[in-house]
A protein has these predicted regions:
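Short, surface-exposed coil-to-beta transition loops
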Residues: 192-197
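Serine hydrolase/lipase
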Residues: 2-112
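N-terminal segment of the mature soluble domain
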Residues: 112-178, 208-211, 241-248, 254
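Beta-hairpin (beta-strand-turn-beta-strand) motif
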Residues: 181-185, 202-204
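C-terminal/domain-edge helix-coil "capping" segments
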Residues: 103-111, 134, 142-144, 171, ...
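Short His-Asn-centered micro-motif
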Residues: 9-13, 180-181, 199
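Soluble non-cytosolic domains of exported or imported proteins
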Residues: 16, 35, 123-134, 159, ...
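Solvent-exposed loop/turn segments at secondary-structure junctions
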Residues: 13-17, 37-42, 47, 120-123, ...
Length: 256
């Protein structure tokens, strides 16, 4: 298979092969080597003492000292990879190479969903993980053929009463309303926390269709994995009640 059709990605500093391996396959593989600043086995040591030949493109993540003990955790690499993806994607949007997801989309014959998103103050800001609310918003937008994001930053300063949400959703012509809230609190003296996703589904007349809560335990790393698991559960619940929800894993980063 031509190397243009696939990319091989390695995490950490794996022993790819010796000089003979590199000569045989080096120009046949589109290789991306991802390492981090706290990797216990630097590639240079493998090169000098192990006889391994490093090739391909090298990307190094500068990880927070707070998670240096998790430097070989694949969940850590997933957290950082999503963060790096957003940085690269935003640059591409600025350069006009890519287009950001629209905050409203209409597909003929598909019910319009008014989407409301809430990020609780208790959700700690961690500099070494991506914007969880952005990830969740984009995943929800990928679930609905027709949607309009009514507010992606619900908080105490922009409080809407239930009747306000109903009225505003009716004004845009929505048939259904989905309210998604995320929260995360870390108990004192604990090295883990829980990422919580609340999801409420209503008809535009205000009647309740479904309301559920999902929670996943998160350590120093694993935020994206926990978010993805919550999203998969939330999507399964949506599909029980809204048959037009996309059945394809179009956007789920957790689907790896």
């Amino acid at each position: 298979m031509p190397k243009e059709k696939f990319t091989v990605i390695t995490f950490g500093a794996p022993a790819i092969g010796n000089d003979e391996f590199a000569m045989e396959y080096g120009d046949k593989i589109d290789l991306l080597r991802v390492t981090n600043t706290s990797d216990p086995i630097p590639g240079s040591l493998q090169t000098f003492f192990g006889g391994y030949k490093q090739f391909g493109e090298h990307v190094k993540y500068h990880i927070s000292p707070r998670i240096s003990s998790n430097n070989h955790d694949i969940a850590m690499y997933l957290d950082y990879s999503v963060s790096e993806y957003y940085k690269a994607f935003d640059k591409a949007v600025t350069a006009g190479i890519a287009k950001a997801l629209p905050y409203n989309k209409t597909t003929p014959g598909k019910p319009l969903v008014a989407l409301w998103l809430h990020g609780a103050p208790g959700l700690e800001k961690r500099s070494y993980v991506p914007d969880i609310k952005r990830l969740i918003a984009e995943e929800y937008m990928g679930m609905f053929p027709s949607y309009v994001v009514m507010d992606d930053a619900l908080d105490a300063d922009a409080f809407y009463r239930h009747e306000d949400i109903i009225r505003l959703s009716q004004e845009v012509g929505a048939e259904y309303i989905v309210v998604c809230g995320i929260d995360g609190n870390q108990a004192k003296d604990k090295n883990y926390w829980y990422l919580i996703l609340n999801q409420g589904v209503f008809k535009v007349d205000g009647s309740l269709v479904s309301i559920v809560t999902f929670a996943k335990k998160v350590g120093a790393t694993g935020t994206i994995q926990a978010t993805g698991e919550n999203l998969l559960n939330a999507k399964e619940e949506l599909q029980k009640h809204l048959p037009f929800v996309s059945t394809e894993q179009q956007k789920l980063i957790c689907n790896y």
